[in-house]
């Protein structure tokens, strides 16, 4: 990274800062690297004063922790409102798959929050076509994943062994312990995810499902103006999509089923 970055940018000072942060103790380094991304924008534009700069930070909220998510977005907002001298505008786009982080940020009104569903069927088919054969037919791949590209890649890596992927999800999400505690409620959520939206359902279960990234809760209206790209259907029982709650992917629902069995 150091070699390529120096050759491409000739900004050795910035490389030194990133390398120094990365060499520190884990945890401290993650936070410092995430905040350095903001500093990097200011530094680059003050040095170059030309062209455009893009800084991409992946999984920032996982690295810095939910409690710092709002502060991080506020720092990005400061860049937007007060761009470095010589720059006309700054655009900040922050994406997260963590359900709780959206609520943490949204309560401060520092960002315009828009949901993005899995890939549209047309876009997903383009991705599917690039995967080499042998493979199941497209409709089967769509039925299993609901357009989730990560689930598609897991199926491909598992040589389309659905049971292997499901068992991996059960282990990774710790679903057997959750089923022991919430079996009766989970049976209803597997039957229809909107059951989770009922008042008599335990909040603790809802929070667990969100924290384990198994569901999307309190879905936006399906009008295109509320969504980035194509919104999901109003309801689709086969894909596990309800009006207010949806499984992240049909395979997430299958994993909960598998844990119950």
Please give the residue ranges for each predicted region.
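C-terminal leucine-rich, beta-strand-based interaction scaffolds used for sensing/assembly
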Residues: 6, 172-261
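A short helix-turn-beta junction within AAA+ P-loop NTPase domains corresponding to the substrate/partner-engaging
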Residues: 2-3, 104-122
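Conserved AAA+ ATPase "sensor/coupling" helix adjacent to the nucleotide-binding pocket
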Residues: 110, 126-133, 158
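Short loop/turn segments at strand-loop or loop-helix junctions that form parts
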Residues: 2-5, 55-61, 220
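Conserved NTP-binding/hydrolysis module of P-loop NTPases
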Residues: 1-31
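Conserved Walker B catalytic segment
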Residues: 30-108
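Amphipathic alpha-helical "lid/sensor" segments that cap RecA-like P-loop NTPase cores
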Residues: 133-185, 203-211, 219
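Non-catalytic recognition/regulatory regions in large multidomain proteins
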Residues: 62-65, 85, 130-138, 143
């Amino acid at each position: 990274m150091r070699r390529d970055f120096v050759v491409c940018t000739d900004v050795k000072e910035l490389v030194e800062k990133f390398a120094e942060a990365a060499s520190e103790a884990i945890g401290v380094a993650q936070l410092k690297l995430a905040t350095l991304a903001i500093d990097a924008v200011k530094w680059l534009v003050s040095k170059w004063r030309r062209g455009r700069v893009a800084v991409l930070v992946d999984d920032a909220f996982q690295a810095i922790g939910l409690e710092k998510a709002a502060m991080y977005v506020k720092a990005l907002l400061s860049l937007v409102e007060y761009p470095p001298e010589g720059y006309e505008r700054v655009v900040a786009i922050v994406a997260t798959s963590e359900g709780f982080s959206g609520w943490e940020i949204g309560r401060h009104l520092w960002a315009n929050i828009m949901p993005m569903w899995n890939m549209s069927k047309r876009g997903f088919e383009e991705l599917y076509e690039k995967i080499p054969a042998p493979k199941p037919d497209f409709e089967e791949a769509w039925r299993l994943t609901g357009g989730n590209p990560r689930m598609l890649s897991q199926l491909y890596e598992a040589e389309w062994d659905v049971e292997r992927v499901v068992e991996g999800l059960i282990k990774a999400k710790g679903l057997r312990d959750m089923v022991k505690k919430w079996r009766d409620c989970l049976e209803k959520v597997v039957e229809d995810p909107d059951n989770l939206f009922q008042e008599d359902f335990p909040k603790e279960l809802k929070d667990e499902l969100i924290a384990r990234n198994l569901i999307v809760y309190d879905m936006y209206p399906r009008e295109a103006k509320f969504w980035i790209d194509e919104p999901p259907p109003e309801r689709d029982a086969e894909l596990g999509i309800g009006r207010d709650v949806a499984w992240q992917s049909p395979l997430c629902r299958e994993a909960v089923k598998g844990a119950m069995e």
